[in-house]
Amino acid sequence: LQSHKHDISFHGGYIGFFSYDYGADQFVDVSSHPQPSFFLGEYSTFLKFQDGAWYFYSDEKQAQHIYESISSLLSQAQEDQSTALQLLKKCAPRWSKAQYFAAFNRVQEYIKAGDCYQINLTQEFKATAQGTLLSKAEQLWQLTHAPYAGYLKLDNFELLSCSPELFIEFQHERKIKTRPIKGTMPRFNDPNQDHAANAKLSNPEKDQAENVMIV
């Protein structure tokens, strides 16, 4: 852990998440676990992993004390092997193969009926484990090389994430940047390659649908 100052996009503020369950819960009861589906917390102290190291940021008056407390907790965590995440029972899907195909066929009927344009059909995978997700965070991020990632712990609830996509970034002078991947293609300096990529993106129905829905 190092105390360092970088020109970073995040200088403190809200950290949290919105889950799909939060949106769905406005219309149907989807609660199956005692865990939050939405959380926002305002933080002026945070850690960020960049350039191969962790950096500490804080606008608090007691920043030095907070830094020392976090350093102490991290040292204790490294010595405590009980926090290492271990699977006690393998991951298993909530649905059987037959149940998944039934849900898939129902989605097709919804689309044919015009009730929806696209549906992202997913299901829950469950496992029994001991330890904390934090012990696997760095390993996951190094494995995926995802440019956007985070870890959040709320009481007994943990959230570990990584993504290649940037949804929304608020910049200076009221600018908003987004970098989706679905329905997009890379740009090329060569005009012929750029034109070919544009044609490839414009023609397939799948890419057109994703572009209309997401981009």
Positions of the model-derived regions?
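Extended alpha-helical targeting/anchoring segments
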Residues: 1-215
